[in-house]
Design a protein with these regions (language model features):
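N-terminal hydrophobic/helix-forming segments and targeting peptides
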Residues: 1-452
């Protein structure tokens, strides 16, 4: 499963070692390289497209007719921040085997007209929270900027990816001498406390000047931007025996990456395999490129029709389909063991986590849980279970949201991790391998032979 784009020198060395390299470490190194080189959802989707094309997938455009054939593989994007890849078997298909993950993570977005002058000495950037984050870890660390820039080019408007890959801004904390409450549950204000320092006044360099220089364009050609702050600390393998990994955006790019590698490697004979990566999960999914949109439904209908099906055959195929909604889960934290449910206590490095919720925040029920457990057993992948404590409300994720558009059996899963929604998260070195093995087996499984 070595399809990651922009392979680093470190990863090349790992691949050259071949069978001598630990399979778990190898998968984790590929994931870390993917995270380090793709700092925004737009970079992630572009990288996935390159991975798919390298593996023989053909790109489709929503604005054009879907011309597809049996035995071929394709992908389609929306907003350049969501992507659906799919592989069609050589014979008539029975249903759809679908995995879903999301491309976005909590961060700060740079507002329009962002530069603010302070005390006639400094320039700050006006930013706003994106998603529900742990705010404190963003302070006192060098930050970069990444996203997309819309540029006027002749009579056309072009999209350019931007990654300012240097230490360009920072949010310094207020010294303990001026904030004696800092270690007593201080509540950060999202407007006043989190404006990163950008420059000294008198430097005569604006944010748009830097953007224009990075992209090699005229500043006057910049029409608009979607830009986010990025944590510049690289991913790493750590622990006494290299048992753990740490990186930004493990939630949910671990599932994004594992699904992409798995669908490339899978040999699906009975069902159409699809890997969906939606945007905006962290802010409710209610966008044209989110899980609540018609993106998945539109693709399924068009694929079925392009293969000669009608509305009735589409509904039959959906009834024989299954979704794995993959969004990371909370590991028991060694310093906060009381925060976990007393009976369902997943930990890092112990396998895929199946998530349950009595109030239907997750899609898993006895049927879908049984199917996925059986698939994991066949893949020789260990399984754990997660539920919230009964006095803690849980959030919903991709499965239930997408089921409002395409109703089918689904299971919610993820990999156990610590510090979810921090700019730097931790997990187990074995878990990317486990997830890839489980997803590959899922793509290759005839669900109708198990259940319907």
């Amino acid at each position: 499963m070595a399809w990651a784009s922009n392979i680093s020198d470190t990863c090349i060395i790992l691949f050259m070692k071949g069978k001598s390299m630990d399979k778990y470490l190898e998968a984790s190194k590929r994931l870390i390289n993917f995270l380090d080189t793709n700092p925004s959802p737009f970079h992630v989707i572009a990288a996935l497209g390159k991975m798919y094309e390298k593996a023989g997938f053909k790109r489709l455009l929503e604005k054009e007719r879907f011309d597809i054939k049996k035995g071929e593989s394709y992908y389609v994007t929306r907003n350049n921040s969501s992507i659906i890849a799919f592989k069609i078997p050589k014979k008539d298909f029975k249903g759809f085997n679908i995995t879903a993950a999301h491309s976005d993570s909590p961060t700060f977005k740079i507002k329009a007209n962002a530069e603010i002058t302070v005390e006639k000495n400094f320039v700050k950037l006006n930013v706003e929270k994106y998603g529900g984050m742990l705010m404190a870890p963003w302070f006192d660390r060098p930050l970069g900027i990444a996203g997309r820039v819309m540029v006027k080019s002749g009579t056309k408007i072009e999209e350019h990816l931007l990654h300012i890959d240097r230490d360009i801004i920072m949010m310094p904390n207020l010294a303990i001498h001026m904030n004696r409450e800092a270690n007593d549950g201080y509540k950060y204000n999202a407007q006043t406390d989190t404006q990163p320092i950008f420059a000294e006044i008198g430097s005569d360099v604006t944010l748009y000047d830097i953007i224009a220089k990075e992209l090699g364009i005229s500043k006057s050609a910049i029409l608009d931007t979607d830009l986010f702050l990025t944590n510049r600390v690289k991913g790493t393998v750590w622990g006494a025996n290299n048992e753990f990994i740490a990186a930004g955006r493990l939630d949910d790019l671990q599932c994004v990456f594992a699904g992409a590698e798995s669908i490339i490697e899978a040999e699906n004979k009975d069902n159409i395999a699809l890997h969906c990566v939606f945007d905006n999960e962290e802010v409710g999914s209610g966008t044209k490129q989110g899980a609540a949109s018609t993106f998945l439904k539109d693709v399924l209908i068009r694929v079925n029709k392009a293969l000669g099906g009608d509305e009735e055959s589409y509904l039959q195929a959906v009834a024989r389909s299954f979704m794995v909604s993959a969004d990371n889960a909370h590991s028991v934290h060694p310093n906060y063991t009381e925060k976990a449910d007393p009976c369902n206590r997943p930990v890092v490095n112990k396998g895929v986590v199946i998530k349950y919720n009595a109030n239907q925040k997750y899609t898993t029920d006895a049927v879908s849980g049984a199917v996925f457990r059986d698939i994991c057993a066949e893949a020789e992948v260990p399984v754990q279970t997660f539920t919230n404590r009964s006095d803690v409300a849980g959030g919903s994720t991709l499965g239930n949201i997408s089921n409002t558009q395409v109703s089918l059996n689904a299971v919610d899963i993820g990999m156990a991790q610590w510090a979810m929604h921090s700019p730097y998260e931790s997990g187990g070195v074995k878990d990317t391998y486990y997830l890839e093995a489980a997803m590959k087996k899922f793509f290759e499984t005839d669900i109708s032979g198990k259940l319907y």
